[in-house]
């Protein structure tokens, strides 16, 4: 015996392929475009419970998060988000506050932002991570997809890591940090992984491996609960899902629908492959790390590693082929239109590309970038 502690973690039973979405949004002052710490004031208009769908707060007081209920169809989950956002906008408008979403704010400074008070979880995180934790002025989209058996969680997670650079590049929306162009499509990706419990998951094969890891990490005081692991893709045992968290925040419901459809189709296909007794694809951990960096740095111009053999392709070309392959699955799940929206992102550019174009058209000024992000979100709501 090696003396390691295995912590039994029950994986909730969830109808397969049901999807839920969490969308983090920034509150900005309508006049200046600066971040505004008004989320606590906005949230007073919403009930304080975890019923789905719901609106909640986040780490910083400048952020609200809208959370859908789980649905079999992506479109229904997105409808939840749209209804919630409409309600948030109705509360924020009289305050002179707009909503925007991107992986980072183009120019607001992190020292000026306030951490949500009276939250033990956030206080513990900040006490442990200090300077790096204080800088987490970032926003993302999280997509949950249900799987019916926890034994499938790690094989599917490892197979999803093969697709992580596609997720990263398609959603990349954080080219700026504190008023500077970073040269990265997703500066958020590299910021977030500075936290000791964030970033890529470790190399695990079975649910027992995961339980042993959680037991070890709890035993040595790294975490108190498995929910404190903020991996790019992680099991969510409480909900019976795999949660893809790598996405930068995106500003339109259409893009969210497309990204969610992509994940739903992949999880559905991979789960079916396991049912057929097939071995799922996975890549060497250093390939996964390299792919994440390439996608964060170059976005849609990244040449990504496609498989364990080291074959490479431009992420846009690779993504087009993937969408075509998944089309029958999308048709069966009722999300074919949403999945094909991925091709629109490839054709018109991811958010970081659109932001850079706006900055260039305005001689490098970044206030118009915030205006652009606000308008993208509002236009997606039909406002």
From Swiss-Prot:
| Pfam families in alphabetical order | GCS2 (PF04107)
The main enzyme category here is ligase
This protein's source sits in the domain of life called Bacteria
Whether Transmembrane helix counts among this entry's keywords is no
Question: What keywords tag this UniProt record?
Answer: ATP-binding, Ligase, Nucleotide-binding
SUPFAM superfamilies assigned? Glutamine synthetase/guanido kinase
- Give me the reactions it catalyses: L-cysteine + L-glutamate + ATP = gamma-L-glutamyl-L-cysteine + ADP + phosphate + H(+)
Tagged with keyword Cell membrane: no
This entry's Enzyme Commission designation comes to 6.3.2.2
One GO molecular function term? Answer: glutamate-cysteine ligase activity
Q: Which GO terms describe its biological process?
A: modified amino acid biosynthetic process
Similarity comment: family membership: Belongs to the glutamate--cysteine ligase type 2 family. YbdK subfamily.
UniProt function note: ATP-dependent carboxylate-amine ligase which exhibits weak glutamate--cysteine ligase activity.
PANTHER family (alphabetical): GLUTAMATE--CYSTEINE LIGASE 2-RELATED
Instruction: Tell me what this protein is called.
Output: Putative glutamate--cysteine ligase 2
């Amino acid at each position: 015996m090696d003396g390691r502690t295995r912590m039994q973690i029950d994986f909730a039973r969830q109808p397969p392929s049901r999807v839920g979405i969490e969308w983090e949004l920034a509150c900005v002052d309508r006049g200046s475009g600066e971040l505004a710490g008004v989320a606590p004031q906005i949230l007073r208009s919403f009930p304080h419970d975890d019923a789905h769908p719901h609106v909640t707060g986040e780490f910083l007081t400048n952020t609200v998060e809208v959370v859908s209920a789980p649905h079999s169809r992506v479109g229904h989950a997105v409808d939840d988000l749209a209804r919630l956002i409409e309600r948030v906008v109705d509360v924020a408008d009289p305050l002179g506050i707009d909503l925007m979403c991107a992986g980072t704010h183009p120019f607001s400074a992190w020292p000026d932002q306030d951490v949500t008070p009276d939250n033990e979880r956030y206080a513990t995180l900040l006490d442990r991570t200090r300077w790096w934790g204080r800088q987490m002025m970032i926003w993302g989209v999280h997509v949950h997809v249900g799987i019916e058996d926890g034994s499938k969680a790690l094989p599917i997670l490892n197979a999803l890591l093969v697709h992580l650079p596609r997720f990263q590049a398609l959603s990349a929306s954080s080219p700026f940090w504190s008023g500077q162009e970073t040269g990265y499509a997703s500066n958020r990706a590299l910021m977030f992984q500075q936290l000791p419990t964030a970033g890529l998951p470790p190399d695990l094969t079975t649910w027992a491996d995961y339980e042993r890891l959680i037991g070890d990490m709890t035993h040595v005081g790294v975490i108190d609960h498995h929910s404190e692991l903020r991996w790019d893709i992680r099991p969510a045992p409480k909900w019976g899902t795999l949660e893809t968290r790598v996405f930068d925040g995106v500003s339109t419901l259409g893009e969210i629908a497309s990204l969610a459809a992509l994940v739903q189709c992949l999880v559905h296909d991979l789960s079916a492959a396991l049912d057929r007794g097939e071995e799922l694809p996975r890549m060497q951990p250093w390939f996964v790390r390299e792919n994440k960096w390439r996608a964060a740095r170059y976005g849609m111009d990244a040449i990504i590693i496609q498989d364990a053999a080291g074959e490479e392709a431009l992420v846009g070309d690779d993504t087009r082929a993937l969408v075509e392959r998944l089309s029958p699955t999308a048709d069966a799940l009722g999300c074919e239109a949403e999945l094909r929206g991925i091709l629109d992102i490839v054709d018109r550019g991811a958010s970081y590309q659109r932001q850079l174009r706006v900055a260039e058209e305005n001689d490098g000024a970044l206030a118009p970038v915030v205006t652009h992000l606000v308008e993208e979100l509002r236009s997606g709501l039909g406002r």
